Amino acid sequence: MLKVGVVGCGAIASLITKALMSDRLNKAEVLAFYDGNLEKAEKLAMETGADFCRSLDELVSKDLDLIVECASVTAVEDTVIKSLNNGKDVIIMSVGAFADKDLFLKLYKLAEKLERKIYIPSGAVAGIDAVKSGSLGKISDVTLTTTKPVHGLKNALEEQGLNTDEIKEPKTVFEGTVFEAISKFPQNINVSVVLSLASRYPAKVKIIADPCAVVNRHEIFVKGSIGTIKTCVENNPCRDNPKTSALAAYSVIRLIKDLSEPIRIGT
């Protein structure tokens, strides 16, 4: 059985944990939690019967195979370094942290040196397998257009001085590079970094706030020597965290299951 620890105990962590608990094959189990908000970690531990850790050091010192980061971009560096140094592989949900090229290279080299793995799930978009394969050729264009309900972008927009109550129709609130996008929308546009890493090409990003939208819509366009890849996914937002698509959480669950099963489908 794959023994899992979780960093960050919000809605996504709860969804992942409960899905693994309900898996009849029982090939992976969450055994311990840590969150900077200790009350959240203790609450989720009590709900699931897992251990509650008072520090990240305590979590990574436990007998675990895998650490799943569900916290924030600011938690990624510390989580990965301590997990790898304690012999654990890591799944990163807050992949926006890897828009920092220096951090990505630093953690890549550490994982390589220690012969451990850092896993980045496909998240809330479709076609990542095809994009990865296509990146072996020449990529000439990568574009992501994301449309979300206004309330899902509310915090990021208001931090930029926009009054979301004044958005009465679909409004383009951002156009620019993946690096600019993740700095302005760190909890909303992780998929742009996944796409850029998979394609090995910096994505152009457009974000639309739509007051009538009820789903998170991600449209991908990739052009290269292999031809053209176009995908469109309309995701239901996570019920308890509308900034994130439910599919993003399910992609982590699927990855954990793949790591514990003898046959893996897809690139």
UniProtKB/Swiss-Prot annotation:
Alphabetic keyword roster: NAD, NADP, Oxidoreductase, Pyridine nucleotide biosynthesis
Binding site residues for NAD(+): 124, 190
Family matches, as Gene3D superfamilies: Dihydrodipicolinate Reductase, domain 2 (3.30.360.10), NAD(P)-binding Rossmann-like Domain (3.40.50.720)
Reaction equations catalysed: L-aspartate + NADP(+) + H2O = oxaloacetate + NH4(+) + NADPH + H(+); L-aspartate + NAD(+) + H2O = oxaloacetate + NH4(+) + NADH + H(+)
Active site: 218
Coiled-coil stretches: none
Alphabetical GO biological process terms: NAD biosynthetic process
Enzyme class, UniProt record, top EC level: oxidoreductase
Enzyme Commission number(s) of this protein: 1.4.1.21
Pfam families: Asp_DH_C, NAD_binding_3
Recorded metabolic or biological pathway in which this protein acts: Cofactor biosynthesis; NAD(+) biosynthesis; iminoaspartate from L-aspartate (dehydrogenase route): step 1/1
Molecular-function GO terms, alphabetical: aspartate dehydrogenase activity; NAD binding; NADP binding; oxidoreductase activity, acting on the CH-NH2 group of donors, NAD or NADP as acceptor
Note: The iminoaspartate product is unstable in aqueous solution and can decompose to oxaloacetate and ammonia.
Family: Belongs to the L-aspartate dehydrogenase family.
Protein function: Specifically catalyzes the NAD or NADP-dependent dehydrogenation of L-aspartate to iminoaspartate.
The name this protein goes by in its record: L-aspartate dehydrogenase
